[in-house]
Amino acid sequence: MSASCAVPRLTRFAVFAVAGATALSLSACGSSNKSSSTSTSTSTSTSTVTSAAPSSTPNAEAKVSGLIASVAGNSIQVTKEDNATAAVNFTSATKITEAVPAGLPDVTQGSCLIVKPTEGSAPGQPVTAAKVKISESVNGTCPKPHESTPGGASSTPPSGSPSPAPAKPAWVRGSVASVSGDTINLTGTDASGNTTQTTVTVDDKTKYTKQTTANTEAIAPGKCLSARGTTDSGGALQATSIKLRQAVDGKCGKPKQPGQGG
């Protein structure tokens, strides 16, 4: 009886041993799979982090303003207000204009004016001109600004903050309807497209400049430049238009806003 009982005990021991070995094998496979998965995930993550960012899109609209440092052939090196440099290229098709000193006799019927009012001028009222910028119309029409005319706009300050300084008078622009003595009548268009009439008075303190057509010979070191065009793949501006003006004490100051000339 005792010999026959020993056989089943040995059989049960063998079954338990096989089951244990199978469990250990499955556990090892699971660990191997997890390790492989972790390795794959780490590799993917590393690849994502080290991928390079795309370069800037060429042919994007751009502008460059600053002091002309040098001119070589059809390429201009410009020193910007922040002392960074920029390359501007031009061709025979580039429109070039230059602001030159002018006077009241240059203000004629049909010419286009951009007027900076003196301090204290009220919106919608006759203004006294501190500066007058003159340009010729194109097909009988004065060009529209690229952006809003400076001045006149103010934002509401946060509650409890000090009262802001009064907004500077907005620049006035339009076509000269008539000139009589020291009075200029301008016809313009407001933001809603409605026709406006503005009376502008000038005095002996009013300063005048006139935008005249220029050629490539006018592009010279020491002048201020404002150019518009598109950037090429190398980052240079391919200029479609260039505006020039004289520097003041070798400086150009901050880039002029649309409506301020230059």
UniProtKB/Swiss-Prot annotation:
Sites of N-palmitoyl cysteine lipidation: C29
Membrane topology: Lipid-anchor
Lipidation (S-diacylglycerol cysteine): C29
TM stretches of this protein: none
GO CC terms, sorted: plasma membrane
InterPro entries for the chain: DUF5666 (IPR043724)
Keywords tagged on the record: Cell membrane, Lipoprotein, Membrane, Palmitate, Signal
Low complexity bias spans: 28-57, 148-158
Secretion signal span: 1-28
Domain of life: Bacteria
Chain spans, region Disordered: 28-60, 138-171
Predominant location: membrane
Subcellular location: Cell membrane
The name this protein goes by in its record: 27 kDa lipoprotein antigen
Protein's organism: Mycobacterium intracellulare
Organism phylogeny: Bacteria, Bacillati, Actinomycetota, Actinomycetes, Mycobacteriales
Gene that this polypeptide is encoded by: Mi43
